[in-house]
């Protein structure tokens, strides 16, 4: 729900601040609106992205396992930093491939065991599996099955499996493998991937998605490749993630905004050294993919005989960078997003759910993006109102660019006064 809030600012002694964007609402014709500046061609993206995935399918034995990272629904981060990107673009892109696509939803047994909750929705991962199934099927997408990963006899995972099976949903299990992911000799063997269930699929494109990170999407893809090759099918693997965008500069504000969004995960964008060595081209990836690539490469070699990819960048299919039509608009939108993330991290710190390290990291990203807090128009407006009244104040920027403020009084808090104004 926080993504639906208007842009507002509440300065206090600890600078406890919220800065959120609203969902765009229908606007009156002819209204002046700075948000109408478009930096991203969404129609071009839908066409180019779906074509590129089809092309990747054709390079293998008409069978591609696509690890789908990030949010499929309501990707407001992408829509904020790439003005013109629709929050449901990735879902719409998949719908263009609906006749070829089959979805497998992955969930980790340890996450079921500890009732892991999605921070943005406030529901447990197992409940989100059912929500995702409903969302996909209501849009005409085929969900073939659910896969429980890292299984080691958890009772809660057994109960969840039975619950799904009673609903008529196919459920497969991937077991916890000792030494994963480094012990490739064991992993790529009958005692490793060989012990896992083989997920029966019927379509050329198998989209592997999950309620959240760390669910085992890549492990599921590689386990399936092992089983497919055992059956004589030369299936392939690819990775779909919007950020970081591989073919724009490392320190481009769009990529810096991704680092700000993942400050709590300690993700760091970096030049892909494997791609640079193989092709002499500079591309951007993030640390976790770069660090795991030698292991993934070794697994591919054991499964296929050779690795089809020379770098983590090669594995990706993201076309977003090719659809930026106004770079300056995207840069400015991304600077605004980094400022928003800074105040969100400050709020998390004050409420005890964040860390100083997150705040420090985003402060550094602000400097790298050549942005200041005052670049967000509501900030100086609220600070000025606070200075005038000597009490916390709030400011909101309307869609037409006007700034509204609210002050603290005996009757109302600053936010309440702001909304009334």
Annotate the PLM regions:
Residues 220:
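Hydrophobic positions on the alpha1 helix immediately C-terminal to the Walker A/P-loop
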Residues 388-392:
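Short, small/polar residue-rich loop motifs at catalytic or cofactor-binding pockets
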Residues 215-216:
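Conserved glycine(s) of the Walker
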Residues 407-408:
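Short clusters of small/polar residues that mark proteolytic maturation junctions
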Residues 411-421:
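A short, polar/charged loop-to-alpha-helix boundary motif
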Residues 3-6, 10-16, 23:
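Charged/polar low-complexity intrinsically disordered segments
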Residues 30-209, 224-376, 381-383, 398-400:
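Flexible phosphate-sensing "switch/lid" loops adjacent to ATP/NTP-binding sites
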């Amino acid at each position: 729900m926080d993504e639906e809030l208007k842009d507002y600012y509440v300065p206090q002694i600890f600078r406890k601040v919220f800065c959120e964007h609203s969902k765009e609402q229908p606007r009156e014709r002819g209204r002046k609106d700075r948000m109408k500046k478009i930096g991203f061609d969404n129609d071009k993206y839908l066409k180019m992205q779906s074509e590129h995935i089809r092309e990747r399918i054709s390079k293998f034995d008409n069978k591609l396992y696509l690890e789908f990272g990030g949010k499929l629904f309501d990707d407001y981060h992408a829509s904020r930093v790439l003005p013109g990107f629709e929050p449901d673009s990735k879902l719409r892109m998949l719908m263009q491939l609906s006749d070829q696509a089959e979805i497998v939803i992955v969930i980790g047994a340890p996450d079921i065991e500890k009732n892991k909750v999605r921070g943005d929705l406030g529901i447990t991962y197992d409940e989100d599996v059912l929500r995702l199934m409903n969302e996909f099927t209501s849009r005409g997408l085929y969900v073939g099955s659910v896969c429980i990963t890292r299984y080691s006899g958890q009772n809660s995972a057994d109960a969840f499996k039975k619950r799904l099976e009673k609903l008529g949903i196919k459920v497969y299990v991937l077991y916890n493998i000792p030494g994963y992911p480094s012990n490739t000799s064991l992993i790529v063997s009958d005692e490793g991937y060989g012990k896992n269930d083989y997920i029966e699929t019927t379509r050329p494109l198998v989209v592997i998605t999950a309620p959240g990170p760390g669910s085992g999407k890549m492990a599921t893809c590689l386990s399936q490749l092992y089983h497919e090759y055992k059956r004589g099918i030369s299936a392939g693997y690819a990775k779909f993630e919007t950020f970081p965008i591989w073919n724009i500069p490392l320190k481009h504000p769009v990529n810096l905004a991704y680092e700000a969004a993942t400050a709590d995960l300690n993700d760091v964008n970096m030049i892909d050294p494997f791609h640079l060595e193989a092709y002499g081209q500079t591309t951007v990836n993030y640390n976790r993919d770069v660090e795991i690539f030698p292991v993934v490469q070794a697994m591919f070699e054991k499964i296929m005989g050779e690795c089809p990819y020379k770098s983590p960048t090669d594995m990706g299919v993201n076309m977003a960078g090719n659809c930026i039509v106004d770079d300056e608009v995207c840069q400015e939108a991304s600077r605004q997003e980094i400022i928003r993330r800074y105040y969100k991290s400050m709020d998390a710190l004050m409420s005890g759910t964040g860390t100083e390290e997150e705040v420090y990291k985003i402060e550094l990203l602000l400097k790298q993006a050549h942005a200041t807090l005052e670049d967000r128009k509501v900030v100086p407006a609220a600070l000025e109102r606070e200075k005038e009244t000597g009490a916390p104040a709030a400011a909101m920027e309307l869609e037409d660019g006007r700034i509204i403020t609210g002050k603290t009084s005996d009757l109302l808090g600053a936010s309440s006064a702001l909304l009334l104004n």
